[in-house]
């Protein structure tokens, strides 16, 4: 009996910048896949899904899938990521907003 595994290469890093993760309190409202941009909620101060309203407001990228029951979120706080690998909000279609979403942080979009 042979066990067959399927390997799918997933390399979201787009450059040689070191990628570091951190943990922070979150308040997701639904199941959220890894590689989703995050921002700080202005009222609670917790991490939530970036709304895409303003470039420079995103603070991190969700590192592992999480949901509304996840009190603490693992997220990338630094690194370079390919623009096509980040799960952008559907309302954000302007590439300039995507590339500058993390302005002022240690995250680069390439």
UniProtKB/Swiss-Prot annotation:
Lineage top rank: taxon: Viruses
Gene Ontology CC terms: viral capsid, decoration
Compartment(s): Virion
Keyword match Transferase: no
Pfam families: HDPD (PF02924)
Chief place of localization: virion
The keyword Membrane is assigned to this record: no
Cited function: Putative decoration protein.
Name recorded for this polypeptide: Putative decoration protein
Gene this protein is translated from: gene 7
